Amino acid sequence: MQRQKIREIVIGTNNKGKLREIRDLIPKKVKVLSLKNTTAKSPKETSKTFKGNALLKAKYYSKLTGKICLADDSGLEIDLLNKAPGIYSARWSGKKNNFNLAIKKVIKKINLKDKNWKKRNIKARFKCALAIYGTDFKTVNVIGKIEGTISKKKLGSRGFGYDPIFIPIGKKITFGQMRPEMKHKIDHRFKAFKKIRKFF
């Protein structure tokens, strides 16, 4: 199978934040389709890795729509919590995708591990796996990551997910405080997308 240039792609996510960020990364000449006109539920994420779950979702939505699909699986790893929440990052937010709840859970678990954690840097990283799948397209599966630390409290209202508690390495503010144009030049999703940009 030849790797033809992609001119139309389905973004396999129901997460509005992810959809917005991925859409911003894809060249304007490419027609981007969302899942808003489909009634399918998200597939069960049964893999133990980000790359495995991204591919699982790309295959599922490609077969559902009959089109080439790009899917994302991403999350936050915190060293003090043995790399949790990791692949379960979204699930920590509950059925209603309440990331305020997820952030409170993170802080609570860190507190249980180390009551003096605010006096030191808690190492963490964001990871993003991107997979492209289509019937006549050779599968692509890549990962990007950015190292950083957990902030002492929730800061900022931009972005989504765990952005308000993650300070990327070399910066003094959280992703939640950053302007989107700044975040999108350094984050894990941008780093993963750089590896697949040539296919568009």
Describe the predicted segments one by one:
Residues 2-12, 16-200:
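Anionic-ligand binding patches
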